Swiss-Prot record:
This is Glycerol-3-phosphate acyltransferase. Pfam families: Acyltransferase (PF01553), GPAT_C (PF19277). It comes from Mycobacterium bovis (strain BCG / Pasteur 1173P2). The keyword Acyltransferase applies. It catalyses: sn-glycerol 3-phosphate + an acyl-CoA = a 1-acyl-sn-glycero-3-phosphate + CoA.
Amino acid sequence: MTKPAADASAVLTAEDTLVLASTATPVEMELIMGWLGQQRARHPDSKFDILKLPPRNAPPAALTALVEQLEPGFASSPQSGEDRSIVPVRVIWLPPADRSRAGKVAALLPGRDPYHPSQRQQRRILRTDPRRARVVAGESAKVSELRQQWRDTTVAEHKRDFAQFVSRRALLALARAEYRILGPQYKSPRLVKPEMLASARFRAGLDRIPGATVEDAGKMLDELSTGWSQVSVDLVSVLGRLASRGFDPEFDYDEYQVAAMRAALEAHPAVLLFSHRSYIDGVVVPVAMQDNRLPPVHMFGGINLSFGLMGPLMRRSGMIFIRRNIGNDPLYKYVLKEYVGYVVEKRFNLSWSIEGTRSRTGKMLPPKLGLMSYVADAYLDGRSDDILLQGVSICFDQLHEITEYAAYARGAEKTPEGLRWLYNFIKAQGERNFGKIYVRFPEAVSMRQYLGAPHGELTQDPAAKRLALQKMSFEVAWRILQATPVTATGLVSALLLTTRGTALTLDQLHHTLQDSLDYLERKQSPVSTSALRLRSREGVRAAADALSNGHPVTRVDSGREPVWYIAPDDEHAAAFYRNSVIHAFLETSIVELALAHAKHAEGDRVAAFWAQAMRLRDLLKFDFYFADSTAFRANIAQEMAWHQDWEDHLGVGGNEIDAMLYAKRPLMSDAMLRVFFEAYEIVADVLRDAPPDIGPEELTELALGLGRQFVAQGRVRSSEPVSTLLFATARQVAVDQELIAPAADLAERRVAFRRELRNILRDFDYVEQIARNQFVAREFKARQGRDRI
């Protein structure tokens, strides 16, 4: 038989060693025996015994030989017994180096798994490509060390239980040796269920839950376990490319960020928290890890996605399906918490959406703390000396799901997931080109930095712990936003939404966009390659055309030159793209509104400016992320630095403020924020004569009806603010203002709140007029230039 390759780690050094051979076929045993013969030849004075490792879930009788070998003083050698070394060994089979994408898919068929070839296939491999067979040895351990671990970590006492423990440790050691050869992307937790059920820690917690049984806990662990396989790992990239085939095949990464994350993941386990705009995100993260040869992630997903053949396949690719609404099931909550802790303790990486669900508006939602609290508990309990929270920004040039989101905004119901839904989803990806997918990895947040050392004060103070979790989660989300590149799609959509259906020419689009690009360059904000191309007329044309045909822009080219506009029915879809770039213009938009407010203020206009800036921040806090108050004030001051002696000019007021705003480039508040305050104002108008404790559904229905009336009357600029999604946060604002609870002065405060919002909308009108004057002046100047030519 042709000799296989041996891994460098597959060398025996101890004088008395028991080799546990994990084999599935006689061919593998022959290879291991050949390797063992080489070891005996190198160390003629050493004693190497070999025993076939019992398979998982082997009957008690299969463990008899191992039980005997583990008995103290079993062998005659003086070094035998407790000082004897245990070394697990197996043969791994590598896939062909030139395997195609079709070959990876074919591996799903019976008998085609390249990692587990049949005996006949193994003999053929050894004849034709023996380098694909490799003998590997796991890390060795002394019997005494294993016995001490067994006593410290399990509740078992029988010597047969010890043999099972040694078998599990051997398989885990082999798994580690295997992924060192195959690559970090194949790293996955093994034997989770038997390890956890045998754990003294787990069983002690189980005893504290009334009515809990080991059997029920085991079933829940089966539901959570991933059942990872190498073939499924290979399929991750194939399925990922299939689901994202409408995009450029290569994802856009920042190589410096990838290198920094690789170094961080070598030191600590991590939770990858990604922004969530599309179902595609679920494949983007695993593919991104594979693309960059990084350890895989075990991604949490709703059990509603575990349907048909996709459920088992996604499980074997690392998806952990969790139930929803688990508040009344203490056993499930406990098992899930311990499962998360176990995975973290074993230094595997987890991943889920920091927002908990897809953002159907295009902007980031507030972070959800449920799973995060379980990870924090594992850290505070000392299961890791630190855990990194690695943000992941995922953004797209375009998404086909915006049509669905626009329907949600108008009040439509969510389409249930299923095989038909999956077919339609994948089919839609191939209908046209959606541009690029941008993946960014900002600097990770250290859990130790926010929660202190393990076993610290937060373990005894739930309120302080929750506050620390909130601050930590918001910091992750903030870093995600700061790393998210501004796209051409977002900028073009934002501009065309401001025209309220009036079409713009290519020259008008091009010269108006330059102010925004200049601002982003001054701020050193990250921008996509598509946004960089907006510097040229050709880049603007390409961006506008990519959005045309109702996606969501309409192009008219039946006249002298093409023009582009957004029709009323497409405003909700376009708003998704606009909302994805608001974070880059949020503070400068607030500056404009605060200046407009100060123009009409009595007394100290500088104080009025700052008071209004902080008030706007407070009103918008449910829709957007902000820096803390101190940093926010510093950012606003920096935004005003474009105008020399701005406080002096602001204090004068009147025409000085007009001049300040006219000189400001760009003016973005109307484009970015108006729609949110219009939605707030609609809800405030509904509250005028609504019951004190009006429910969310009733409030939304009334707001939809009133909003449609306002659109018909021209009392709002477009149909965009008439959105169930915006009304949901508008209600949060009202609750925060204590306007949805019985009170003696409730009616007066509701009227006052509506008046405040109308005054803010008046400020929008003021800034918008100045922006229009800027546009007209640019048009006049451009026309003069063309006339000279």
